[in-house]
């Protein structure tokens, strides 16, 4: 069995008296696609931040065995990047915050940027201002940015937010192609499970300081979610899509959408 590219061991995270999760043991295998779900404030984004070292766990450990690529949430007011060329945005991933690169470093950087742009079919956007591109085109560039270091695992934070259905499918197909070609694992935080349903190997569902891990069928069923929330939840499959209804706080709505947090 291949060594896990990401491992949570007895991990937990609490803020004051509020626990987001505890006793989480999770091994992410090369090429595995894990969807991270949960309601507003359950800690999905915070989970990714713990992998990035931006938030310290209060219990246990998290270990990444390989390079990490990160696709952050898009924000409508992200004006700092709108005037950049596509190539410049992607180049931030290759730079890694380094300064003073020599000629050899610049050539290597250019090669990696060009390769990443080509991998996501975004070469034609290389010299276009990011602000002139559609949301889907911008997201191609952010995926390319994450790929410049040839990551073993991709952390994706709501990469489908604010995208139309066509652009959502493009993004999901790009990520799936990468994991199949390079065995890059994907940890995918999302409001909507249905767009990625055909690709998901396992679900990590966070809610009320607890969690469930398993296949889609093991987690996304009425009994499992009702137990997790402590209130009646109904899960129905309609035409190959999941519909989740229930919860007095209206965590669920048709086609498994969540009114989730911007920084959960």
Please state what every model-predicted region is.
Residues 154-158:
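Catalytic Walker B motif of ABC-type/P-loop ATPase nucleotide-binding domains
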Residues 129-133, 137:
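Conserved ABC ATPase signature
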Residues 202-216:
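H-loop (His-switch) and adjacent beta-strand-loop-beta switch element
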Residues 150:
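Conserved catalytic motifs of ABC-family nucleotide-binding domains
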Residues 91, 106-125:
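Conserved ABC ATPase "signature" region
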Residues 190-191:
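H-loop/switch region of ABC-family ATPase nucleotide-binding domains
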Residues 221-223, 227-264:
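ABC ATPase nucleotide-binding domains
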């Amino acid at each position: 069995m291949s060594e896990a590219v990401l491992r949570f061991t007895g991990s937990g995270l609490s803020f004051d008296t509020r626990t987001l999760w505890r006793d989480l043991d999770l091994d992410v295998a090369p090429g595995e696609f894990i969807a991270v779900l949960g309601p507003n404030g359950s800690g999905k984004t915070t989970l990714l931040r713990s992998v990035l070292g931006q938030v310290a766990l209060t219990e246990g450990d998290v270990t990444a065995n390989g390079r990490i690529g990160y696709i952050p949430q898009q924000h409508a007011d992200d004006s700092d990047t709108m005037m950049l060329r596509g190539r410049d945005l992607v180049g931030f991933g290759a730079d890694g915050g380094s300064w003073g690169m020599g000629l050899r470093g610049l050539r290597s950087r250019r090669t990696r940027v060009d390769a990443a742009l080509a991998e996501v079919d975004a070469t034609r956007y290389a010299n276009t201002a990011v602000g002139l591109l559609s949301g889907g085109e911008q997201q191609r560039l952010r995926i390319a940015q994450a790929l410049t270091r040839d990551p073993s695992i991709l952390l994706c934070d709501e990469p489908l937010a604010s995208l139309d259905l066509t652009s959502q499918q493009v993004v999901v197909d790009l990520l799936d192609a990468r994991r199949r070609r390079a065995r890059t694992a994907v940890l995918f935080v999302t409001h909507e499970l249905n767009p990625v349903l055909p690709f998901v190997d396992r679900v990590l569902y966070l809610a009320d300081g607890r969690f469930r891990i398993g296949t889609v069928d093991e987690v996304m069923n009425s009994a499992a979610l009702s137990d997790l929330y402590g209130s009646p939840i109904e899960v129905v499959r309609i035409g190959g899509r999941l519909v989740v209804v229930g919860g007095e706080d209206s965590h669920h709505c048709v086609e498994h959408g969540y009114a989730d947090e911007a920084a959960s």
